[in-house]
Amino acid sequence: MKNIIRRPYLDKIEQALGKDTIIVLVGQRRIGKSYLLRQLRDEKAQDSSANIIFVDKEKKEFDDIRDYHDLNAFIDGHRVKEKTNYILVDEIQDIAEFERTVRSYREEPGTEIVITGSNSFMLSSELTTLIGGRYKEIYVQALSYNEFLTFHQLPDNDDSLAKYINLGGLPGLQKMGLDENDVREYQQDVLNTVLLKDVIMRNNIRNPVFLDNLIRFLADNTGKIISANSISKFMRAQGQSITSTAVINYIKALCETYVIHKVNRFDIHGKRLFESNDKYYFEDNGIRNCLGGGNREGDIEKVMENVVYNHLVRLGYEVTVGQLQASEIDFVCSKPTGERVYVQVAYIIADEATRKREFGNLRAIHDNYPKYVISMTPLVTRSDDDGIIHLNLRKFLKEGLV
């Protein structure tokens, strides 16, 4: 099996090395953090001045490393003072009080630390407290469409796009030949591991049945504006009593695993964020489809929106949902530089009513920021309709907002 280099992420790691900072790779389990860490290990192993200290907490040979004392002892037993020591630890959140180790060795000369973790609360909140925020977080996403084509040696065509939309971008699918039955079984195993290890065990969840129902509800309502209160009411109607506070806590726990992402609403006129009624998207559209039935009629727009959201994040945008009086803009995308774009997602612009709705919402925004409609309308690759750019989904995933 060909070893595919995820160069953009390795470049980000390289740029952060040598700056007396801890590099933290974060993201959902099985998204490729371990793969990247091994690639970094293999690249640095070619350097005679480098000494690699590698710990993978998912491998049985490292079971004895349970807390920071064990980790310190392992590192001390493998350090070479005359070389640059690269301390690489995979799934570090499974080591009790790991923060003490990374804080201590960060200050050692000739030492670089790169760690991975699946739980954002463990990494972001506790590291900030214990090491004063002196770390670089690199968020690793599921495969992009371009990476998907490379991993699976596929041509760029509509059939490959359909596979990407349906099966998603977990790197582990490379081993399965994209057989849908095998893929769904693998995705369910990944999800079960995340729910058990990163949600139920870590948060002492006492109602796993509701947790399962909740994530299925979020899959079925991908891209819809929902609230904790509306979920609570829906669950009560299904015979399951749950408070809005409990819903909020369960969703927070899910977001901390990176399986789902909460997207706030943004008041375009008032230029402020709303404090309630958000949208949720899945890190991997394949896992979303595993839960929500990606081949069902009516699901395609939900999945498309999920795919577009993730690619906008991949392009470096902070993404919110736009509220414009009574109408909605699917995505308001901004960067720290002040750049902003508006994006509407539609499956097919098949008639004038659809065109009026999708383009009309964007025309109601009276500013000069770029505006896009992304669709799968046949024969459309890129067109300009009175200043609103209509992009084909495949072109967007290949080339970005062009």
Which role fits each region the language model picked out?
Residues L36, L40:
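Hydrophobic positions on the alpha1 helix immediately C-terminal to the Walker A/P-loop
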Residues I53-K83:
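Short glycine-rich substrate-engagement loop in P-loop NTPases that contacts/grips substrate
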Residues F121-E137, H152-Q153:
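Short regulatory helix/loop adjacent to the ATP-binding pocket of P-loop NTPases
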Residues L25:
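Hydrophobic anchor at the beta1->P-loop junction of P-loop NTPases
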Residues E112-S118, Y139:
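Structural recognition of the conserved hydrophobic beta-strand(s) that form the central parallel beta-sheet
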Residues E180-E339:
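Accessory nucleic acid-recognition modules appended to NTPase machines
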Residues K33:
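Conserved lysine of the Walker
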Residues M1-E14:
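N-terminal pre-Walker A segment at the start of P-loop NTPase domains
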